Amino acid sequence: MIKRIVDISKNLKKGKVLIVYGPRQVGKTTLIQEYLSKTSFKYKYSIGDDLQLARDLSKCTITSTINYVGNYDLLVIDEAQKIPNIELALKLMVDTFPEKYFIATGSSSFDLASQTAESLTGRKNVIDLYPISQFELSKDISRDELIHQIESFLIYGSYPDVLNQTTYLEKEKVIKQLTNSYLLNYYCFKPSWCA
C-alpha cells in the first residue's frame, strides 16, 4: 500500500469536524481505516449507507445526538453526504460535545461541501484527497521505475485501483468503470439549470 502524505492526526482538532473530501475511489476510507488502526481513541465508525443511522441522525435532536455519540472520543461517518441533514447533525454534535473529535468523509465534494458550508462555518477542518501523487509514488517506487511508467500514469492516472492493476487492459477496464460511474451519476442527478 502506498503511504499518503495526508496526515489525519495533524488535522484532527477537538470541537471541529474533519471533513475529508475527494472523488470516488481515491482512498478516503482506506486513509481513515489506516488512521483508526493506530489511534488510541475510543472510536465509533459508521457508514452513511446505514439506513438506521441516517434516520437517527437526520432527526437532529439532542436525544439522537447523545445516543449516537455515547462515550466515544472520536466519531467517524464515512460517506456522510448520504445522510439527510448531515450538516445540522454534525453541527449539533460539535456544539453539544466540543471535547470530542469528529471525522466525516464525502465522495461527492459538491454535495457535502454545499451541505456543510454554512452550518459548519468555524467548526470544520477540510482535507481534499486526490488520486495518488507522483510525490507519494516516489516514496515507494524508484525514480527509474517512475520514469519507465510515466506513459501509463499519463494515460490511466493514479487512482489506487488503477495502480494495483498489472496490465494495460486491466487499467483500462478500471478507469472506464470509474468514468462511467461519474457520467451515469451526472446524467441521473445533473443540475436543473443544465439542459
Feature names for model-found ranges:
Residues Y43-L74:
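Short glycine-rich substrate-engagement loop in P-loop NTPases that contacts/grips substrate
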Residues M1-K13:
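Pre-Walker A adenine-sensing motif
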Residues D128-A195:
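Interdomain hinge/linker elements that couple catalytic modules in large macromolecular machines
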Residues K28:
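Conserved lysine of the Walker
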Residues L31, Y35:
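Hydrophobic positions on the alpha1 helix immediately C-terminal to the Walker A/P-loop
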Residues E87-F110, E118-S119:
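Conserved catalytic/switch belt of AAA+ P-loop NTPases
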Residues F110-V126, I141:
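Short regulatory helix/loop adjacent to the ATP-binding pocket of P-loop NTPases
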Residues V20:
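Hydrophobic anchor at the beta1->P-loop junction of P-loop NTPases
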